[in-house]
Amino acid sequence: MRYRTLGKDLTVSALGLGCMGMTGVYGEAADRSAMIKLIHDAFDRGVTFFDTAEAYGPFTNEELVGEALAPIRDKVVIATKFGFDINLKTGERSGGVNSRPEHIRAVAEAALTRLKTDRIDLFYQHRVDPAVPIEGVAGVIMDLVW
């Protein structure tokens, strides 16, 4: 496997595993234990970059990825996203986008719990919210990083 550096020091496998389809975003959810095995098999073959999002499920994909990667957390890079207007308690979708700073912070906190981790390695905007200036989005991300 080849590896690349993102930014200053985030080393990832050249091939990443997008986990969206594992929890039924399109069609039926795959067998949970089979998907955990697939994630482990990918890691065993050198994949260290795993992508998920709150919107997948919603929430169930982050939970699956968190469970699968918990035993090897310090050896992998996890990416997740924000930007949809999803009720963080019920999972109900409004059909819109939401990148208000307070929502981004809440999504990050909830993702940490679902992913069973103390950090999100790559956290990015899934959909642009035209109601929120990009400077506001960048500012809250910078606050979360520091």
Where do the language-model regions lie?
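N-terminal binding-site loop/beta-alpha segment at the start of enzyme catalytic domains
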Residues: 1-80, 146
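Small/flexible residues
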Residues: 4-6, 83, 102, 129
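A periodicity- and composition-biased signal for non-globular, repetitive helical segments
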Residues: 8-10, 87, 133
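A short alpha-helix capping/helix-coil boundary motif
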Residues: 16-19, 45, 87-90, 119-122
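Feature marks short, surface-exposed loop/turn motifs that line or immediately flank catalytic pockets
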Residues: 21-24, 56, 84-88, 126-129
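Low-complexity, flexible helical/coil segments
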Residues: 49-55, 85-88, 113-117
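Structural motif corresponding to the early beta-alpha repeats
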Residues: 71-99
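Glycine/proline-rich, positively charged
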Residues: 89-146
